[in-house]
Design a protein with these regions (language model features):
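Basic, glycine/lysine-rich polyanion-binding surfaces/domains
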Residues: 2-187
Length: 187
C-alpha cells in the first residue's frame, strides 16, 4: 500500500499517485557490439547474456576479483551482436575502462553510448501494458521500454530511445520522484 500523507521530511516527493515520465540524466549507456559481445559480457557480468532474448532484460553486476560489486546494470540485447548496459553515469567511465582491459582477442567493441540515447523513467499509467511485468522489454523499432519492479505500488519502466526523441507524451515528473521510487522498489 503506498504511503499517503506527508512525511516528516517535507522535501520527500511522496504523494498519493504518480504518473508520467522523468528524465534520467544521471544514467548512461555502455554499448557492446560484435560477434562476441554477448559471450564477452556474459563472462564479465553476473548474468547470462548469451541466452538473453530480445524481449527480456537482466539486472547484472560487475564485480572485482573478491566478488565485491563495482557497478550494476540493466542490460538488454536488441539484436544478436549488440548489448546495451544502462548504469549510473558516475560509474560509467571507470567501469568501461575496466571492461576494456579484458576484451583482448574477443570480437567486441565497447563504447560510451550515452550521447546516442535518451533515457526516461516511466511511472504509473504511463507504463505501456506490455511492460507491466518486471524485466520484460517492448521494442518499437528504435526505442525500447523495459519493465522494472514497482516502487511504492507504482508500475515503473525505463524508456531507452535515440537521442533527441521523446518518450510517449505524458506529464513530466521530477528526477527526484524517480529516484525515490527507485529506492522504494528495493532493487
Amino acid at each position: 500500500m503506498p504511503f499517503k500523507g506527508k512525511s516528516r521530511d517535507d522535501n520527500s516527493p511522496m504523494t498519493e499517485t504518480f504518473s508520467g515520465a522523468s528524465p534520467l540524466p544521471h544514467w548512461g549507456v555502455i554499448r557492446a557490439r560484435g560477434a562476441d559481445a554477448a559471450q564477452f559480457i556474459h563472462g564479465q557480468l553476473s548474468q547470462d547474456f548469451v541466452l538473453l532474448g530480445p524481449d527480456q532484460a537482466r539486472l547484472a553486476a560487475f564485480c572485482n576479483a573478491k566478488g565485491r560489486m563495482q557497478a550494476s546494470f540493466i542490460g538488454i540485447k536488441p539484436d544478436a551482436q549488440t548489448i546495451l548496459l544502462v548504469c549510473e553515469r558516475s560509474l560509467l567511465a571507470q567501469t568501461l575502462k575496466r571492461l576494456r582491459m579484458f576484451v583482448l582477442r574477443a570480437q567486441c567493441q565497447l563504447d560510451d553510448a550515452s550521447e546516442a540515447f535518451a533515457l526516461w523513467g516511466l511511472v504509473g499509467a504511463s507504463v505501456p501494458a506490455p511492460c507491466t511485468s518486471a524485466w520484460q522489454v517492448h521494442s518499437d523499432g528504435t526505442a525500447h521500454t523495459i519493465g522494472l519492479p514497482p516502487g511504492a505500488d507504482h508500475a515503473r519502466a525505463l524508456w531507452l530511445g535515440p537521442a533527441g526523441t521523446a518518450p510517449p507524451q505524458v506529464p513530466q515528473l521530477p528526477t527526484a520522484t524517480w529516484q525515490w521510487l527507485e529506492v522504494m522498489s528495493a532493487v
